[in-house]
Amino acid sequence: GELVEEGTLFVIDGEQHGYVEKSKKDSCYFAYSDGEPFFWIGINLCFPTAYEISSGSEFALSGNVAYLGLRQYESWMKKCAKHGVNIVRIWLGHEYWSPDTENTYELDSVKLSKIDKLVDLAKKHSLKLKLTVEQFRYFDHDKKSVFNKHLCHCGVPCESIRKWLSNEDYIEAWMYKIGELAKRYSGDTTVAMIELWNEMNAVGGEADLIMEWNKRILPRVKALFPHQLVTNSLGSLDSEGIAKFYKDFCWDDTDALQIHRYLDQGAPYKICGDNLIPSIKEAFSFMRTKERPMLLAETGAVNNCHSSEFKYYSADDRGIIFVDCVYTPLFVKSAGCGNIWHWDRRYVESKNLYKYFKPLRKLVDGVDFTSEAFEHLDLSTDKAHILLLRGRKTTLGFVRNKSDNWMKTLRDMREPEPIDVHIQTSGKGINIIPIWKYDTDAFTFLADGVTIKGLRYGFLFKYES
């Protein structure tokens, strides 16, 4: 062709690192397309708060609900970004976001526009998104519920999960929806992960069918979202039956292995009703893999058998459940922090716990998780949890007074007994990162480490080898 005009192209380095993917250097962690490490500091912000609408009479309700919606997300995302969060999870199947109508192949353009606006908000606050496509568990065309689905194909209602999972018409209709989402977001680096379903085993006793569906669908979704992480999730790992589902699941077809675990005194596994730190350690030990990143994708505390949010949340002004849930996974070689549930007025928002992301962010900033070849160590004593992540150049640590637990501090309303702790180091000066103010009587820095006198709660630390 004809040269119209000759010039010089200047390329300027920017802050865009590409997509979030499994690290090519260490498959236990995430990195951007350009190799820059990405340590996942996430939270569930799955759906907006529903506010019941007045009927116009004093104290009377209409039975309908309204949402602040995107305005509420603006507030949440602003707080998250300010305190160090870098990724949030959204349930696209919730009625506020879901583009589904009651007919297959008919999508709601208004709902798709809301998702577009959500992506714009995430960009504005430099946050990544994990999009969970579905969370429904049954079909009941006479009932309204967050876990219910109304869907027809060619005018005929779908009446069972079995039919939805096995019928080619419904499978292809669902893939059409995924294709429409892919047209909008598969080329967008803000979208880091596509999760097919929230706790898919909860749809009922269709284990073989669920496995078959996932083995077939996960590769097809990955083909539509080749640059995003693609995975799925299962319910809380708290019983032998669920544990078998976790072990048998086709994680080899995913880009990340996800665990859900809560403090739940009604769980068949008794460890789930005790202290969160050993419970989280046990879950990661059970599912340990070197093939792909692991995440504690849902965590927190619930009343027996997930009947409601934890009754002692109201007493947790210092966020001790938050800290133990969110911080612990890092020290068992998770690819990210624990992603807390109950993000809204049930816990995180009402107690203003966003600030506790900051110490964690300060700890991980500047650490190249993909190059350290980290190993996790447990040096706990009878009085303190002492968890280390030791790498080639950097060691990260988490110390918690064992008496500062939910049973003593929240239920019994007793102050923890102060303890003395010595942290031995083999490198340069130790950097103490406080979590709570007025936590200790004194830090004494010695040639071989640091001695802490009168530790009430806990702290983070790191040092260079």
Positions of the model-derived regions?
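Ligand-binding face of N-terminal immunoglobulin V-set domains in extracellular IgSF glycoproteins
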Residues: 1-12
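Active-site mouth of glycoside hydrolases
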Residues: 14-19, 23-268, 278, 289-290
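Catalytic-core region of carbohydrate-active enzymes that cleave or remodel glycosidic bonds
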Residues: 127, 217-229, 248-348, 355
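Short, electropositive alpha-helical surface patch
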Residues: 142-155, 312-317, 354-358
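Aromatic- and carboxylate-lined catalytic core of secreted/periplasmic carbohydrate-active enzymes
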Residues: 293-294, 302-304, 318-444, 453-464
